[in-house]
Amino acid sequence: MNAPAKFSTSQIRSDFLAFFEGKGHTIVPSAPLVPGNDPTLLFTNSGMVQFKDVFLGAEKRSYVRAADVQRCLRAGGKHNDLDSVGYTARHHTFFEMLGNWSFGDYFKKDAIAWAWELLTQVWKLPADRLLVTVYHTDEEAFELWRDMIGIPESRIVRIGDNKGAPYASDNFWQMADTGPCGPCTEIFFDHGDHIAGGPPGSPDEDGDRFIEIWNLVFMQFDRQPDGTLVPLPAPCVDTGMGLERLAAILQHVHTNYEIDVFQALIGKASALTGIADLENKSLRVIADHIRACSFLIVDGVLPSNEGRGYVLRRIIRRALRHGWMLGVRQLFFSKMVPTLVELMGEAYPELVVAQETVARALLAEEERFAETLDAGMKIFDDVASRSQEIIPGADAFRLYDTYGFPVDLTADIARERGMRVDMEGFEFAMERQRETARAAGKFGGGVALPADLVATMAPTVFLGYEAQDADALKVVALLKQGRPVDRAEAGDEVIVFTDRTPFYAESGGQVGDSGQLSGTDVSIEVADTQKFAGQFHGHVGRIAEGALKLGDVLSGGIDVQRRGKTILNHSATHLLHAALREVLGTHVQQKGSLVAPDRLRFDFSHFQPITAEELAVIERKVNAEVRTNHSVEVHNMAMQEALDFGAMALFGEKYGERVRVLKMGGYSTELCGGTHVSRTGDIGLFKITSEGGVSSGVRRIEAVTGQGALDYVAEEERRLGEAANLLGGNSTEIVDKVRALTDRQKRLERELESLKAKLASGATADLGASAVDVAGVKVIAVRLEGFDAKALREAMDRLKQQLGDSVIVLAGAAGGKVALVAGVNGGPTGKVKAGELLGHIASQIGGKGGGRPDLAQGGGEDGPALATALQGVPSWVKQHLG
């Protein structure tokens, strides 16, 4: 029998797409690893994610047949293969899924025929090495395989409900407990009887002999709440085939790590680490993880301590730790990127575009972790030496919290030593920290609307996009001291809920409105407006006069000036976000914001400090868009329509079926429920006041706008003028004058150091003569006025050269503090230790210190005790000399 043809991974990709394009399919680009239409999903983990809304009927596409190669990630949440990566033949964090789709067009007959044609005619797989499974009641699929394709019944395996419930089967797919579902048929490749394992459905099915290569799902039912299956009017097809495991078969190897892509990456890792054994598991881990990390960064994820960014950090640090295990102490991981681009850049041009960003982000994380890895490993070794089989959860949390060791990294290390981590203890420590954080961040001491009250209320109607005041606002709920009441009196602190309101409730970073509510006999000063249960506007304030009761009808007006300043800052954050992405790269994503009347604060993902030059460019670009005076357009549309419109959605924000889109010319388009200017020119002026780091991978810019920006510039000019006056010149001369001052300061400091050295030299000449002989050893213990630690050390060196065998203690006093230096030279070092001597002296003057046997340093408080301590040195030395 002739061996099947051999295909490269790139060829397999292009063959698949070309084949289905020839069958009338639209070729759809891979969706990002970060799902754009499902904020509840951590990562794209299958090919069907981008088509989910199509299958659910919530979205229509311009085609009914599609094919794609989808990049996927399984390293967090429900689908997490991280612990297995590197230790098994086929587990990966990142993988590619080949898929073809029918949305109410072709069904089982064509799907099965085309799958067989591609496998056996294009890729030349021997038909007698292929085996298929079908759902045990799917007679149609069984007959198609037997009669149309011609597979013997002995190689068609019926799989029943093998997971303990009706339709709970490896061969029955369902999206959820209800909704679209249906049987599937799977195609397996037989590696041969020289490999252990049995066919699917047998007791030995978990062996490696029979490998699933293609799953064809036939969505033909709508599962009802009572469990019954109702036929769908337009059945669909969803297929998935793992590229890596298919490549292993078509390249005549047994494990995925032996295919061309992985062999090239493992070879690069081998060259960087100096490890020649290409089957080394750590090299496999590094090769796998560079793909996952790089494509996550391509799709806008950066290392951080939460969410997707934390998963990325875990993967990076796992790879770095495996490099450390191989003895690598230099930076290496980011150097894998060019090889990856060579291998996958043609299939994914976005990887080529983002190559520099990827390498810089990985290098920054590599440098950061290198600082703590050594220290963290020492802590782990210490904990492991004190533990038997279990690493205590509290210690695992300390490694995570202090040294940045993700718990699965700690578990990985523990497993290699035959140990495990107490995960319950770790989760307890983690939850305790979360509770502390939640308690610190709760508004109003954790005030919440009772569930029974929420059930009786309709969502607040917000009038504030069009109006700044309104009448006929009915009081529908009233809280006093966090509890529902029917009535409140003058002086009471309350939270008032009305059916409608012009007051904006804090959300999306924008602070809530303040203002006034009033009725016939009542006036309420509103200090803030907060959103409760995501849909009710609570007016937080104090009853100034009168009494308020449920059912009262009020008029309300916001603080117009405060809102006016706030909207300038909110609109500016949109322009800033766009400018950051333009200047720094599309990896920049909003991580948080504060939009207040007096300033704006914008947190965003970026892996290094922003240079002064970059800040200047960003500021100029924002002000250019302000001067362009774009009209700010508001569009209300369906979520998918908004995404197609180009609007940016922020992960973590909750969006309804319809969303509000803010468009500022062609520069910025974002989903936003906040209040904004009518034209960008209303912002007036944008001025950055500060930039800095918030946490690893997150930067913060603060800025002011409008009159606040003008006031800021005026204050800066005033300070500049004041500085110029102090320097005796005008503002244009400040730089030259400051430079001259710093040059003069450096010159004077050098002269001062020279004078101190001369003083020390002269002092030592005199001190040598005052040495006391103790058992043949010269002992000096003196106080020197004005000597700092450096001058004391220089004096110590000269005295050692001058005296030979000696014990020397020098105390430099200045400003109520004492610097101590103790030295032991020559013969006495065997019995007299400088560290012990200095500790003895420092303890008498309220200080501390230590060092080597021949030299120690410390300090303490100046006072009478110093003289006593120095006088006692000769007797202490005599005692230790014996």
From Swiss-Prot:
Assigned GO CC terms: cytosol
Note describing how the cofactor binds: Binds 1 zinc ion per subunit.
EC number from the UniProt entry: 6.1.1.7
List of residues binding Zn(2+): H570, H574, C672, H676
Catalysed transformations (reactions): tRNA(Ala) + L-alanine + ATP = L-alanyl-tRNA(Ala) + AMP + diphosphate
Family annotation (InterPro entries): aa-tRNA-synth_II/BPL/LPL, Ala-tRNA-lgiase_IIc, Ala-tRNA-ligase_IIc_anticod-bd, Ala-tRNA-synth_IIc_core, Ala-tRNA-synth_IIc_N, Ala-tRNA_ligase, Ala_tRNA_ligase_euk/bac, DHHA1_dom
Enzyme class per UniProt: ligase
Annotated Gene3D superfamilies: 2.40.30.130, 3.10.310.40, 3.30.54.20, 6.10.250.550, Bira Bifunctional Protein, Domain 2 (3.30.930.10), Threonyl-trna Synthetase, Chain A, domain 2 (3.30.980.10)
Gene Ontology process terms (BP): alanyl-tRNA aminoacylation; negative regulation of DNA-templated transcription
CDD domains: AlaRS_core
One Gene Ontology term of the molecular function aspect: zinc ion binding
Record's keyword terms, sorted: Aminoacyl-tRNA synthetase, ATP-binding, Cytoplasm, Ligase, Metal-binding, Nucleotide-binding, Protein biosynthesis, RNA-binding, tRNA-binding, Zinc
Cofactor(s) for this UniProt protein: Zn(2+)
Pfam entry (one): tRNA-synt_2c
Compartment annotation: Cytoplasm
Major localization class: cytoplasm
Domain topic, free-text comment: Consists of three domains; the N-terminal catalytic domain, the editing domain and the C-terminal C-Ala domain. The editing domain removes incorrectly charged amino acids, while the C-Ala domain, along with tRNA(Ala), serves as a bridge to cooperatively bring together the editing and aminoacylation centers thus stimulating deacylation of misacylated tRNAs.
HAMAP family, A to Z: Ala_tRNA_synth_B
Family: Belongs to the class-II aminoacyl-tRNA synthetase family.
Function of the molecule: Catalyzes the attachment of alanine to tRNA(Ala) in a two-step reaction: alanine is first activated by ATP to form Ala-AMP and then transferred to the acceptor end of tRNA(Ala). Also edits incorrectly charged Ser-tRNA(Ala) and Gly-tRNA(Ala) via its editing domain.
Name of the protein described by the UniProt record: Alanine--tRNA ligase
Organism: Xanthomonas campestris pv. campestris (strain 8004)
